[in-house]
Curated annotation (Swiss-Prot):
CDD domains: UBA_EF-Ts (cd14275). Residues 80-83 are annotated as: Involved in Mg(2+) ion dislocation from EF-Tu. PANTHER family: ELONGATION FACTOR TS, ELONGATION FACTOR TS, MITOCHONDRIAL. It holds the Pfam family EF_TS. This is Elongation factor Ts. Transmembrane segments: none annotated. Keywords: Cytoplasm, Elongation factor, Protein biosynthesis. PROSITE patterns: EF_TS_1, EF_TS_2. Belongs to the EF-Ts family. It comes from Acinetobacter baylyi (strain ATCC 33305 / BD413 / ADP1). Associates with the EF-Tu.GDP complex and induces the exchange of GDP to GTP. It remains bound to the aminoacyl-tRNA.EF-Tu.GTP complex up to the GTP hydrolysis stage on the ribosome. The keyword Disulfide bond does not apply.
Amino acid sequence: MTAITASMVKELRDRTGLAMMECKKALTEANGDIELAIDNLRKSGQAKAAKKAGNIAADGAITIVQDGNKAVLVEVNCQTDFVAKDENFSNFSNAVAKAILASGETDAEKVAELKLEDGQSVEEARIALVQKIGENIQVRRAKIVEGENLAVYKHGLRIGVVVSYTGSAETGKGIAMHVAAFNPVAVSAEAVPADLVAKEKEIAEAKAIESGKPANIVEKMVSGSVEKYLNEVALDRQMYVIDNDKKVADVLKATATNIVEFVRFEVGEGIEKKAEMSFAEEVAAAQAAAK
């Protein structure tokens, strides 16, 4: 009997998109033969899910579910915006979000094992949806936000924001809209991750040195570039989306509002998409997928 290693399970999971436990079970039944495991999966009820798993799922939707002082943002990916608008896809995304919020679990592998209201696991429901719709579908990430007050904002299907705040409800809602539009990195300049500041400084130094200016001038140029960067990415330094004459910091002060935390999800962040297909290629791909 071949020993089933973690690397074997990971390889099968990467190739099929199935949960770790499903992959381990398939490998055990195939005595460690990955290709045989995939063949067996394709012969089973997971056939279409296994076949579609190699397709890049960079479209999709952000779903937000709130319950009192807790809210969850979930990104579920598919391959096309057409499927992202499908009622079955939307129902699945909402069911997953509710299960995550109820359990408090956001780890991808454990989320796959959560039970939905109809008794299916998330993974079972995902596979069934892949078989029904014909696209690769993945629950990519989730984040739970808790706070005294929460403001929720969605821009279509692709962007979702949850803001935890104290103070004015109107300002909280405005900040959620602002975060969706301006995509700040942190609440304040001091909270911007040090590695991002260091990277910006390194780039600024390289440009300044190329200018051939004296060292003291180079130092000022670098300082100015870093300051400009912080003004662009720190929430409190940005110009307010609802009133471009005011900085966010001024609006927060005037309304006695404090931003504790914000989370912004945008569909497909960090996922490399394939080049757009022509209409003829899309038709050919659809015909191939239907076989």
